Amino acid sequence: MKVTFCVRGVLSPLLANLYLHSLDVALTEAGHKVVRYADDFVILCRSQQEAEAALMRVQAWVVANGLALHPEKTHTGDCREPGHGFEFLGYRFECGRRSVRKKSLAALKDVIRHKTRRTRGDSLKRIIEDLNPILRGWFGYFKHALPWTFRLLDGFIRRRLRSLLRKQQKRPGFGRCHADHLRWPNAFFAEQGLFSVYEAYVLARQSR
């Protein structure tokens, strides 16, 4: 079981850490396991009864300190059950699995679309130089997610680049046909130095 909270209001991470420290202490002393970043936190519980008790304890503390809980982000549930997962710090936790939150993945894809827009006149080398730091940083944070995310993301990036190359060569279409895959195979982009999030995941797993 878990209880997910978000304190309503604008608090800087430093201010939130100072202000909410006493809540951390109170919950820990009550036997609860708390994971918190700024004003966003999760309490891990062993039963529904324990989760409800934790919620009541937090509600009492928040009211006593002149704060309020975010109504849409405060809830209890069994994250071991399908459909009852929760999102925290860009990840989604459900049924014992960690996946990238849909909103986080969509935000990255928007950046990639902008960097690989078909009207961009830069060389493939320059575009890859722009992409790689973004992909490395994103992977560094989300490397604990499920591997299929990285496979699909690699495919999305290569399709975007094939479409751009087709446009630069004044070929019709969007670079999604089998002929384009043969003309610019996955190995071609690896040779150009494109960072592969899936290959990075495989290497990270091997180094454990």
For the regions a language model picked out, list residue spans one by one.
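Non-catalytic terminal/accessory segments
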Residues: 1-208
